Amino acid sequence: MRIFFITTDHLELRIWFRDDEDFRVGMNYLAVTAAVTGLKVIAFILMSNHVHILLACPNRVEALSFINHFKQLYGTYYCNRYGERRFFRRNGVDIQEIDPENEGLERVIAYIVMNSVAARICASANSYRWGSGSCYFNDYKETGRSLSSYSGRSRIALLKSKAMLPGNWTVGAGGYVLPESYVSVKGVETLFKSPLRYNFFLNNSSKAKRVKDLSGPAFRDQVISDGFKDLCITLFNKQDAFSLSVEEKAEAVRQLRWRFGADSHQISRVTSFPYSEINEMLSRLP
C-alpha cells in the first residue's frame, strides 16, 4: 500500500469552514468518504481555508477520487447553506506520494497535526477538535454513542448522507463521527513507537518552528469573521461588506487590524476584499 499526502490550495478570499457547524459537517463527510471509498486515513486536519489528508491507498487516482468525493459532498452542503456554486470545484488539490523511509512519514504526520498550533489556534495538537491530532497516544479519548444506536432517519439527519457507515463507529458529544473510528491510530502509534518520540517530531516539525517566529495575539478566522459582521452593523449600520463605501471598508480593515491583530491574508479571507486592496489600506495606517 502506498501513502499519499493530499493538500487543497490555501484560499485567499474565502474560507472553507465559517463556523462550528461547517466544521462538524466536514468531519462527518470525511468519515462518510472514508467509509464509501474504503481507504485508510492515517492523519488529517480541517483548517478554515484548507484541508490536509494523509491516505494509505493503491494509487494516486484513488487518492484523487477520495478528495473529489469529499469536496463534492461538502461543496453541495456549502452551496445549499451559502448559495455559492462551483466554489470547491475551482479549489485546486496537490497530491504527493510520501516515501516512508528515512522518517518521511513521521515528519508528514507531525506537519499535518501541528497546523492548528502553527496558526496559533491552540497550544497543542491534541486539543484541536477538527483533526486527528487528539487520537494518538491519548489516554483520555472522548467516548460517545455508536452509529448502530441511531435510527435510519436520525443517522441520515446527523451525517447529511444516506451512506452506510460501520455501526461500531462512534459519534461524540459534538455531533460528528470521532476520528478514531476510521483513522489508523494503532498504525501511527506503532510507527512512532512511543509518546516521547511522537512529541519529538511534533516539537521539531516545520510548523513548530514557525510558531517560535510568530508573536502577538491570534484569533481563528471564524472569530474575526463574526467580529467583522458586528463591525458592519454597529459602526456603519450595514448588513454586509458589499454595502460598505471605500472609506467604511478602510475603517473596517483598520479595526480588524487593531482589535484582532489580523494580518493581510486573514483579513482578506474573512472579508473577501482583494489582498492587494487590504495591503494598500494597511499601508496608510500610522
What are these regions (language model features)?
Residues 1-43, 57-286:
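Short Pro-Cys-Gly-centered "Cys-loop" motif that presents a nucleophilic cysteine in a tight turn
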Residues 50-58:
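Short beta-strand->loop micro-motif that forms the acidic, two-metal-ion catalytic signature
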